[in-house]
UniProtKB/Swiss-Prot annotation:
Coiled-coil ranges per UniProt: none
HAMAP family membership: Lipoyl_synth
Chain sites annotated for binding [4Fe-4S] cluster 2: C85, C89, C92
UniProt-recorded name of the protein: Lipoyl synthase
Organism: Bartonella bacilliformis (strain ATCC 35685 / KC583 / Herrer 020/F12,63)
Gene coding for it: lipA
Length: 317
């Protein structure tokens, strides 16, 4: 894969398609999007644990707006399999290029960090690793097993890539029995060619459906960003597609443009529209909906897991 260094917006490795993309204007964020800069001592301690264990977090790599809040509460989402992705999605700030070899010691370091932070719930995600025969599935499983050995009471949520063209990869991850299996659709199907060109919408739907077929007790979850120019009825249809795959939990958040080289924000949706989506989603049968401008897949993941457990218990009581 040919890559270039984007010296204009950052010193990140970029796919040529992204680095050479014409600049687009970045809209001023509305007041409801703004967050406070992180300053707490707990934030610094969390940062120190991550660095000491030589780990990568999606909180930093993706430029999550909630990093200050989450790290101040000792919440962190670990990104395994390196910090270089094999794909170049138009919304994502993670570096693209040729990844390094898999770090065999990483599962133990992640488990050590989880134990040191005393996490009750942890989220494990990764870059896309199309270069690996199993897409990184076995490494996901090793991380899950390592955490179980050192933090038996910690619940584990995985946020996986689509494992496209990786036969039996999904089965490897599901066999490790994460408590929550998350795979994000990211956007409506009409936007895939521009926003998520390396993925296929209905492959992702089928992936989520297959998880439930293999192990019905694992909670399934998916999320999208809005603001790419999608229509409201497209979002409602996407909800129906997720429910047809028996997905339990959906997240909806506002897309925020990382740099001028990324897909522009077409529209900032006001908070009341997000509240409307949450009500509609509950009516469609999701056990839980998290929908707000600053909602992200891993935001409040531990609290959401407790809500999911209670909702399932009530449903079958």
């Amino acid at each position: 894969m040919v890559t270039v260094v984007d010296k204009v917006t950052s010193m990140r490795v970029r796919h040529p398609e992204k680095a050479h993309r014409p600049d687009t204007s970045i809209q001023k964020k509305p007041d409801w999007i703004r967050v406070k800069a992180p300053t707490s001592q707990v934030y610094k301690e969390t940062h120190g644990i991550v660095r000491a264990n030589k780990l990568v977090t999606v909180c930093e790599e993706a430029g999550c707006p909630n990093v200050g809040e989450c790290w101040s509460q000792r919440h962190a989402s670990f990104m395994i399999l390196g910090e270089i992705c094999t794909r170049a999605c138009a919304f994502c700030n993670v570096a693209t290029g040729i990844p390094l070899a898999v770090d065999d010691d990483e599962p133990e370091r992640v488990a050590d960090a989880v134990a040191q932070m005393g996490l009750k719930h942890v989220v494990i995600t990764s870059v896309d690793r199309d270069d690996l025969a199993d897409g990184g599935a076995q490494h996901f499983a090793k991380v899950i097993y390592a955490i179980r050995r050192k933090s038996l009471g910690t619940t584990i949520e995985v946020l996986t890539p689509d494992f496209r063209h990786k036969d039996h990869a999904l089965e490897i991850v599901v066999a490790a029995k994460p408590d929550v299996f998350n795979h994000n659709l990211e956007t409506v199907p009409s936007k895939y060619l521009k926003v998520r060109p390396g993925a296929r919408y209905f492959h992702s739907i089928r992936l989520l459906q297959r998880v439930k077929e293999i192990d019905p007790m694992i909670f399934t979850k998916s999320g999208i960003m809005v603001g790419f120019g999608e229509e409201r009825n497209e979002i409602l249809q996407l909800m129906d597609d997720l429910r047809s795959a028996d997905v339990d939990f959906m997240t909806i958040g506002q897309y925020l443009q990382p740099t001028r080289k990324h897909h522009p924000v077409i529209r900032f949706l006001p908070p009341d529209e997000f509240e409307s989506f949450a009500k509609i989603g509950k009516a469609k049968g999701f056990l839980h909906m998290a929908s707000s401008p600053l909602t992200r897949s891993s935001h409040h993941a531990g609290d959401d897991f407790e809500i999911l457990k209670k909702a399932r218990a009530q449903k079958f009581s």
